[in-house]
């Protein structure tokens, strides 16, 4: 490991490139916000866990539902989004020898819009005027300024997305007939999904604003919920697609191997983009007013995403085995010993991949009509969400940070920070596994989600939840230790680590891999296919919600 960390930069000069300084400042700004958000959101998560276990009574001026709303908003809309944009803008800078000046400017505009929007949403939460949780659909109503803040966040996403589109389109004009570099290809897929999935939630927010101001008396709840989940469902898979970019492209390079198949990688990206938005109704299986036929169609569309996930599992473990055997691995399973377990850049994403096995299985459970009836409004769902986001996605982001932060900062990963990263990885793994297990188990026993601690009049069933909730609090406490270690490592790598050139690791394709067909570059076709599937999934039910609208709801404030 020390040899890897102390490799002679001069001997690798042809493979290592310093990042454009102006692009580096932009990327560091995004990463700084991302990990500051992790610290704040993590502290709020600890308060939730301790309160939910009955250990901590929160004051009336900062209650559980304020904390829950802020925790979700900060980690879901801020931490992940800033990381994703900073990550892919760094990748495009690396792929294309620097960002175009206008694209860099658009990156800064997006940054400013998102920061402004974030501040506008947080202030009403702190004033206890927006405790509507991350799932901010009606009938609960926040301050209208909360929703106006969301508009700025969405517009910021659009600006960042179009910046990426301009960068890729310009390169393609100058390099006709060539394939877009694989990391930028992943980025294109992610930004396509971000743009199109945010359109429904933008429509929802513009429905809510006049209702929240009191200009109209009621709102169509079913329509608003459906528009939200067209976005919310896709957002989870945007994180997943971002994580898989590191799995496919970076991890093989860190192992000293190569990508198994460029064609398969691009087909997986296309599949995830085309099939993603259409599964929103599987979050609404228990909702009235939606026909069983529509629900089953969306369940099928949700389960279809499992196909590219299985392709990913096959490709990655084929890469692992092939590389490990090249490095001297022997036997049926003995080759695992040749994998770089002491390199945090590999270990954290690998554990994240393994965590996706139970996380994905839980998603299948929640897409199944009968099983969903049992777990839908229980802590099981929170456990599933923390496995998918907290383990699969965030741990991949952590692993990425140990080479990305040095790359954009012009510094080196030291053996000391690598060791801290290994400790952080295991602390986080144990903490999140403990908490997620407790959430799943107590959910099966009937403990509801989205509620503060209560014994429900010392009811025997509720008292039976306490051991699991205590386990939840223990897991949450370990997680905040992991957060502090991670933020410390990021600050060190960004400002205090020794100066040096760190490579943006991009694995080459195997020499004997088949040539990638150019139809994978026909993004116009894939976007049309995506829109056709979206139309199949949503036109009929949304028309039904509008033409045969249920009674509208006035705004409710339940806190």
Predicted feature residues:
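Membrane-interfacial, low-structure loops and terminal tails that flank and connect transmembrane helices
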Residues: 4-20, 173-177, 323-342, 413-415, ...
């Amino acid at each position: 490991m020390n040899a890897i960390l102390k490799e002679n930069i001069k001997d690798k000069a042809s493979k290592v490139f310093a990042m454009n300084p102006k692009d580096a400042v932009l990327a560091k700004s995004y990463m700084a916000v991302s990990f500051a958000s992790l610290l704040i959101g993590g502290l709020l998560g600890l308060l939730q866990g301790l309160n939910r276990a009955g250990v901590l009574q929160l004051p009336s001026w900062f209650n559980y539902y304020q904390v829950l709303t802020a925790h979700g908003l900060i980690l879901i809309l801020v931490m992940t989004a800033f990381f994703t944009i900073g990550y892919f803008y760094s990748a495009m800078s690396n792929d294309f020898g620097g960002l175009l000046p206008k694209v860099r400017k658009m990156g800064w505009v997006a940054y400013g819009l998102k920061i402004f929007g974030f501040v506008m949403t947080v202030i009403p939460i702190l004033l206890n005027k927006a405790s509507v949780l991350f799932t901010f659909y009606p009938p609960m109503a926040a301050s209208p300024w909360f929703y106006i803040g969301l508009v700025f966040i969405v517009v910021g996403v659009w600006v960042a997305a179009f910046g990426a589109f301009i960068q890729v389109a310009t390169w393609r004009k100058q390099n006709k007939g060539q394939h877009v570099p694989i990391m930028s290809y992943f980025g294109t897929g992610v930004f396509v999904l971000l743009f199109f999935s945010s359109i429904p939630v933008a429509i929802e927010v513009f429905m809510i604003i006049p209702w929240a101001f009191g200009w109209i008396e009621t709102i169509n709840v079913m329509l608003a919920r459906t528009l939200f989940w067209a976005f919310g469902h896709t957002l989870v898979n945007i994180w997943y697609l971002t994580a898989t970019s590191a799995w496919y492209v970076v991890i093989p390079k860190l192992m000293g191997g190569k990508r198994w198949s460029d064609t398969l990688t691009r087909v997986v990206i296309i599949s995830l983009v085309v099939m993603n938005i259409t599964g929103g109704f599987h979050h609404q299986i228990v909702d009235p007013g939606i026909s069983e036929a529509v629900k089953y169609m969306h369940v099928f569309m949700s389960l279809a995403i499992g196909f590219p996930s299985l392709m990913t599992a096959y490709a990655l473990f084929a890469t692992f085995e092939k590389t490990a055997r090249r490095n001297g691995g022997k036997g049926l399973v003995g080759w695992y010993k040749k994998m770089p377990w002491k390199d945090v850049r590999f270990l954290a994403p690998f554990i994240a991949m393994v965590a996706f096995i139970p996380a994905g299985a839980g998603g299948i459970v929640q897409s199944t009509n009968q099983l969903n009836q049992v777990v839908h409004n229980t802590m099981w769902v929170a456990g599933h969400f923390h496995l998918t986001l907290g383990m699969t996605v965030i741990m991949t982001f952590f692993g990425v940070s140990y080479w990305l932060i040095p790359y954009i900062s012009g510094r080196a990963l030291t053996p000391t920070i690598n060791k801290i990263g290994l400790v952080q990885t295991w602390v986080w793994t144990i903490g999140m596994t403990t908490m997620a297990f407790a959430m799943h188990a107590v959910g099966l026993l009937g403990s509801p989600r989205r509620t503060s601690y209560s014994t429900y009049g010392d009811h025997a069933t509720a008292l039976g939840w306490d051991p699991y909730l205590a386990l939840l609090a223990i897991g949450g406490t370990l997680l905040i230790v992991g957060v502090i270690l991670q933020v410390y490592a990021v600050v060190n790598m960004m400002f205090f680590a020794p100066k040096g050139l760190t490579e943006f690791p991009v694995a080459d394709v195997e020499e004997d891999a088949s040539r990638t067909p150019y139809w994978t570059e026909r993004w116009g076709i894939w976007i049309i296919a995506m829109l056709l599937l979206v139309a199949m999934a949503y036109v009929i039910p949304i028309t039904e919600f509008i033409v045969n609208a249920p009674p509208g709801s006035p705004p409710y404030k339940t806190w």
